[in-house]
Amino acid sequence: MEKVAELRLRMSEVPPLEDEEDFFNNDQTLVRFLKAREWNVDDAEMLLKSTVEHRRSTKPLHMDCHWCHERPGHHSMRQVGFDESGRPVIYSSFAQASTHKNTVEDSVTHCTYLIENAKRTMGIGTSTWVWIIDCSGMTLTACNPKLGYGVTQVMSNHYPERLGLVICLNHNPVFQGVWKAIKVFLHPNTVAKMKLVRSKDKYLRLFQTYFDDELTNWLMEEIRLNKSKPLSKTQIEFWNPPDEQSKHDPRGCSSYITKFIDSFDRSHSSLTHRPHPNILGSLSGTVRTVSMSSEEQREREGLLSEHSNLVTDQEKTGNISDEDHDDSVVELEISPEFRIPVSEQSASKLS
């Protein structure tokens, strides 16, 4: 605790943040930043001071994703429940996203909104979250190393030691090509938190290891429905409850919905957990109706058509073995706007 006390002393002259006066004085924050820099006080101080100024300028507690308000489903990433340890579980589906033409700015904004609100659901002793990435429906437009790098950079620099586990499923060699480009910038500890699984049996066992029956069953059904073609209206509009109460609810598992959606009080929204922006819009009846452009529709229907030979029938049905294509990586020709900046190529690895 000596280094924690030293870091706290070094931060004593920093003006407090509005609405979160104890952000950089509490033990949990100090320990997270020290762990992220392998207990080097100088490096932890630099990182924490940078984060304080970042929060001072961006005001993340009040951040909202206007992209989702302007185009419902712009991001599908949303909290859907908790794991057995009480960690918030985030689920994202490429098939459900209304566009795959994302930028670093809109992706970072949405991720920040989610993380800040997920923090409000964490119990005492919980500091990390779980992210499930369902790659069904992933198109070539979404294969953007620069986007992935930009998001991981912000998360690593300003939310260190927050990511507990990433489960990536239904991916194909195209995704692995993007992952290969990104992971060289990540700390080995971060890479170790990433689990890539294709086999339905394997990700079921993984879910059963970390989640209770309720969330496991919800995830398995959500994943199954998001592999359907065409995608049903209920799954496309994942922010709305199903027409029939007995049907699967794409907003999340029932315990999460009961506690954080059905009981949501807009008058206290600045102090409490806010679910996905479009779920909030659905509650107030303010979600806009936006149709998918013909260009995006063609891209969806063609699902990686340029590399269709890489997507087997087994992959489409979820029955592929993880042993198949484990080392298969597609070398993509990345357009300049999607490439990771050359100036970052020699940057230190992110933790």
Q: Which sequence ranges carry the predicted segments?
A:
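Basic, amphipathic alpha-helical/coil surface patches used to engage anionic, phosphate-bearing ligands
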Residues: 1-351
